[in-house]
Amino acid sequence: MLTLYSYPELFGVADNNGYGLKVYAFLKLARVPFVHEHVFDASAAPRGQLPYVVDDGETIGDSETIIAHAIAKYRLTIDAALSPEQRRTNHLVTRMLDDLYWVMSYSRWKDDRYYPAFRDAFIAQHKQIDADGFEKAKAYNSQRYHFQGIGRYRCRHLRLHREYLLLSDPDAAEDVR
């Protein structure tokens, strides 16, 4: 049986990471039987990143690769009726949401307006993580944001980038440059 390894739940959502939640939702919608294991330590994961699955002894990382694996292995037809235009729309929305993940994650870990509430809620729900451990996770994520690029934005520009990604103000992209 397929086992999904992802970050733990938070705020009533099955996974507090958008990529893990994407895989979880896909597996549920496609009715693929699976076991869901919540982990904090991603060191066993491919490239040290969650989510990943183990399926009949094969370890697969990356949310889109996991979904492609499930479609092929279990002969899923969940998207079979989509037209070419609908497939393009699906791809564009998926890319937008994947880009938006970084902005939202940054808001949780680096934006002082949101970080205290996120930290306190996380520690309250997951007692095995203390403030020191959480600060280490914050430092780790800060490095990830820098190397990904989102950590090099100024906060005002990051908000404009988020608005642009959400298509609420397409002209905001000019201000980000």
Question: Which residues make up each language-model segment?
Answer:
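GST-like domain detector, emphasizing the conserved glutathione-binding G-site
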Residues: 1-131
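GST-like fold's C-terminal all-alpha helical module
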Residues: 99-177
